[in-house]
Amino acid sequence: MPFGNTHNKFKLNYKPEEEYPDLSKHNNHMAKVLTLELYKKLRDKETPSGFTVDDVIQTGVDNPGHPFIMTVGCVAGDEESYEVFKELFDPIISDRHGGYKPTDKHKTDLNHENLKGGDDLDPNYVLSSRVRTGRSIKGYTLPPHCSRGERRAVEKLSVEALNSLTGEFKGKYYPLKSMTEKEQQQLIDDHFLFDKPVSPLLLASGMARDWPDARGIWHNDNKSFLVWVNEEDHLRVISMEKGGNMKEVFRRFCVGLQKIEEIFKKAGHPFMWNQHLGYVLTCPSNLGTGLRGGVHVKLAHLSKHPKFEEILTRLRLQKRGTGGVDTAAVGSVFDVSNADRLGSSEVEQVQLVVDGVKLMVEMEKKLEKGQSIDDMIPAQK
C-alpha cells in the first residue's frame, strides 16, 4: 500500500486517554475486554488494507448492548484483522465461544452422510427447516471496510460462479437495485431476503454503505437454495424448505456449498479459512462453521414450562422469535438453532439440532396429554 491511513495518523495527535471511548454503560463483549492499556497498545496498528482498532470497535461503541443478548461489539474489516488485533479478538472469541483458546484447532465436516436421522421430525410441529452459513472471498476486504469497486468485483465474481450451477441448483440472480419495493418486501416476508439495513449494528459498522449497490439475492428455481451477496458477509448460503426434513436440507446445503467453493477455487479465489478460526467471517460470533441450523417449531406447552430455558441450554440450542433475532414468538412458534459455531463441525452442530428438536417435540406431546416430562430432562451436552 503506497500510503498509510492518514485519518488514523491524524488521530494519533491526541493522547490515547483523549481518544479512548467511554464504555462505562456498555454490555457487550468488546467493552469487557478493551481497557485503556489495550487501546494504547493497538491504536497505531493497522492491517495491510488500513483497518484500525477504532474501525474494529465502532459498532460496539455506538451500540452499548442489548438487555437480553450479549452482543459482540466488534467486527473484522479484512482477513488480517483477527491477527493484527488478536489481543482484542482472542479474549472476545474465548468469551463468545465457550472458552475457545488461541491454540485450539477448528474442524470442518461437510459430508452430509455423516448426519444421523433428521428425516423424521414431525411436520405437525416442525414447520420449516433451514441451514445457513457465511463465506468470505480471499483477496477482498470484508463488508465493513470494502470499497465500492471491491464490492462490485465480489458481486461480479459471485454471479458468474452461481450462474454456472446446474441441475437442482440452476437459478438466477436478482440485484437489489433493480427490484421494485413490492418484490423486495415479498421476498423479505417469505424469509428469502435480508431486511433493509436499519439494524444499528449493520449501520455503525459501515456494512450498509452505498446500499443497495452490488447487493442481491440468487436462488435456484424452486427457492430451496439461496445465496445473499454482500450483506454482512460476502456470501450467505442458505438451504431451506417447509416441514421437518432436516436431512434433505443439510444434504442440499453441503452439496451446493461445496460446488460453489470448487468454482471459486478454480477462479483463483478460495474462501478465507484457517485451522484455528475455521471460516473467517465479519462477525466473531460466526467464526468456525458460520453455520446456523434452525427449525421453526411449535411448542405451545413446553415454552410455558419452567424448565424450557434450562432444557435449551442443556441441549446447546438457542431460541429466537418467529421472525428471527429480536422478535417475539407468534403462536408459540420458535426459531430453534445450534448455539455453537467454533470448535465443532457442521455435522456435529446440525446433529445437536436434529436430536434436540426431536426430544423437545416428544416432550411437547407428553405435556399435551397432561403428563410429566421430569424424567426426560436431558443432561448437559
From Swiss-Prot:
**Keyword Zinc carried by entry:** no
Q: Which residues bind ATP?
A: 128-132, 191, 236, 292, 320-325, 335
Q: Name one GO biological process term.
A: phosphocreatine biosynthetic process
Where does the Phosphagen kinase N-terminal domain lie?
11-98
Matching Pfam families, A to Z?
ATP-gua_Ptrans (PF00217), ATP-gua_PtransN (PF02807)
**EC identifiers of the protein:** 2.7.3.2
What job does this protein perform?
Answer: Reversibly catalyzes the transfer of phosphate between ATP and various phosphogens (e.g. creatine phosphate). Creatine kinase isoenzymes play a central role in energy transduction in tissues with large, fluctuating energy demands, such as skeletal muscle, heart, brain and spermatozoa.
Q: What is this protein called?
A: Creatine kinase M-type
Organism expressing this protein natively: Homo sapiens (Human)
Its organism's taxonomic lineage begins at:
Eukaryota, Metazoa, Chordata, Craniata, Vertebrata
What would be the name of the gene that encodes this protein? CKM
